[in-house]
Amino acid sequence: MTILDEIAEYARERVKNAKENISLDEIKKKALSMPKGIFAFEKALKKEGMSFICECKKASPSKGLISPEFPYARIAKEYEDAGADCISVLTEPKWFLGNDEYLKEISEKVNIPCIRKDFVVDEYMVYEAKVLGAQAVLLICSILSESEIRHCIGICDELGISALVEVHNEEEIDMAVRAGARIVGVNNRYRAIVVPFIKSHKTLQGFLTSGNPKLRI
């Protein structure tokens, strides 16, 4: 079992526990009662030139503890002041020491779109992201089926938030495109050993732009 498999399995446990406190019907009703979003995340990435998604992350499996103090709200505000277009907020609690409250507070304090960076394994987490103030969610091809990605993108469209679909090979790119992805992120790391591999990004970027000119990367 890879680290990604372990994280995904733990995410399923998290969803199961969350549903015991707030049911799927309740979180769905709450999300749908909120004003529909305007797809601010993907709009922010459509500007001319390079766009920057800056990340608020306390820890990671490969680096361990990154920021012991972790003044996340201040970090997010400094990103915004420095010209960031969007902010990525880790909410995975075990391996990344994230917290849903980080996303909620940051989204209330900044005026740029926030993406919930987590390991979505259930539609529940998409509705939850909307309630927490996210304008986008991360969907990872390696832990979701094509039909699950399509379903989650459909929910995002209904809520007015964006889906950033993560891929790391050509097969996953094809899957993402078939599922209706409008924004694709290329993961530069081999899952099993967690080592950056920049060449893969350049290769896959070429594959994406040559065959799918409307996609944002």
Residue ranges and their predicted role:
Residues 128-148, 185-194:
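Glycine-rich phosphate-binding active-site loops on the catalytic face of alpha/beta enzymes
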Residues 205-207:
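Flavin-dependent oxidoreductase catalytic cores
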Residues 1-114, 121, 155-182, 192, ...:
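Conserved N-terminal beta1-alpha1 strand-loop-helix module at the mouth
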Residues 126, 149, 173:
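Short alpha-helix immediately C-terminal to the canonical SAM-binding loop
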